[in-house]
């Protein structure tokens, strides 16, 4: 099934559940043998806030521009939707992930509540 998917966007907890591996990085790397993956950084203990793209045998870290963010409900869904939208606009997976990371960071900084404001 994974071979027919272009990109999956799990967080650290989801990688552990999908692979049974407590080493999130290794679990994501193992998944990348079957499909492209962006490991979201919000729940990571090894690289908090860093999203890592495993794509065609390479790894790209998207570092957060801000260390102070406010958690939001649905931020993972916003990220995957933003990536899909950027791909639909003709951007590569790498560019789509980077643009989407920056978009989501704006939402995470938008206010102190769990609801995002689009800025």
Segments the model singles out, each with a brief description of its role:
Residues 14, 41-44, 65-68, 100-104:
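Glycine-rich beta-alpha junction loops
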Residues 59-60, 86-100:
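Phosphate-handling active-site elements
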Residues 32, 77-81, 98:
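Internal alpha/beta core interface subdomains
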